[in-house]
């Protein structure tokens, strides 16, 4: 748990989350690693956490309004839906304190990112993780948003040709393969993610 929370804390700090922030986590708590990993990492960073979980969107929006979190954590599609519900409820961006969105668990196009940022008036970033590796904290964007930064002290990424297994050069498109460097319980060697990057 220390390694996991450290990786997530670094990911959050790289986008500007501090111990002055309050984060609303709108991922489901349970066996899904997203909510718990982000919760632990935010606490390690010193940020306060509102563990809302998923669903009941009008209540989620009311909490955004009433409690004033500065960070929203969810899937991009749910963040977009929440912004639409907030608009329908008559809640405008100037009534919210949101400044950062940490989104993951699904892909996010630039078009969707722009809509979320406009819909909530926040700055958003993407992150990547897999339950097999540790969940969130494997990699994420920093405030520059020029690509994902891997936690290379804990994970060794490679890109391979998915048909031949040949390691490809930097910048080529292929399948992401990851070796864990610090996991003790279930270490993985050249784990084929089936994710194309």
Model-predicted regions and their roles:
Residues 1-3:
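Conserved AMP-binding/adenylate-forming core of the ANL superfamily
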Residues 45-197:
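Active-site glycine/GP-rich loop and adjacent strand/helix microenvironment
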Residues 5-22, 57-69:
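Conserved ATP-dependent adenylate/AMP-binding module captured primarily in the ANL superfamily
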Residues 9-41, 45-47:
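Conserved AMP-binding loop of ANL adenylate-forming enzymes
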């Amino acid at each position: 748990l220390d390694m996991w929370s450290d990786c997530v804390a670094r990911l959050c700090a790289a986008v500007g989350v501090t111990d002055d922030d309050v984060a609303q986590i709108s991922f489901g708590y349970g066996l899904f690693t997203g909510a718990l990993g982000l919760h632990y990492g935010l606490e390690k960073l010193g940020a306060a956490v509102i563990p809302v979980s998923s669903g009941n969107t009008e209540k989620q929006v009311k909490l955004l309004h009433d409690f004033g979190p500065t960070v929203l954590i969810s899937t991009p599609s749910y963040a977009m839906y929440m912004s639409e519900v907030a608009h329908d409820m008559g809640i405008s961006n100037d009534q919210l304190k949101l400044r950062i969105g940490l989104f993951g668990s699904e892909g996010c196009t630039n078009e969707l990112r722009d809509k979320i940022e406009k819909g909530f008036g926040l700055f958003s970033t993407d992150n990547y993780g897999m339950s097999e590796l540790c969940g969130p904290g494997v990699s994420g964007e920093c405030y520059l948003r020029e690509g994902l930064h891997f936690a290379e002290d804990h994970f060794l990424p490679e890109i391979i040709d998915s048909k031949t297994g040949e390691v490809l050069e930097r910048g080529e498109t292929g399948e992401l393969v990851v070796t864990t460097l610090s996991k003790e319980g279930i270490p993985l060697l050249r784990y084929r993610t089936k994710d194309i990057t």
